[in-house]
Amino acid sequence: MAVIGTITVTSAGTAVQNPVSGNCRGIMWRARADNTGAVYVGYSNVSSTNGVHISPGDAFTALFNGYERLESWYADAATNSDKVDFIADNS
C-alpha cells in the first residue's frame, strides 16, 4: 500500500518534519515543478549543505534494507513556501 503526501516548507532554512508516521520500505520525493528553488530532504538536521538536493520538477528515491520510519524524514527549501511531494511504500 502506498502513502502519499506533501510537505510545505513555509520558512526557508527551517526543516519541516514529514507529517505522516509509520514504517516504509522506500520513499520517492518530487519537488514541485513550480517551486522557485531547490528542496532538500534528509533527517532532522537537514539543510542546504547536508540534505539531498532536489531541483524543481526533479525526484529522488530512497530504498531501505528493512523499514524506515516516515516521520524520521524532513524537508527544507531554498525558498519560502516551496513544496515537495512524496509517495512511500509501506507494504
Give residue spans per PLM region.
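Ser/Thr- (and often Asn-) enriched beta-sheet segments in non-cytosolic proteins
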Residues: V3-T8, Y40, H53, Y74, ...
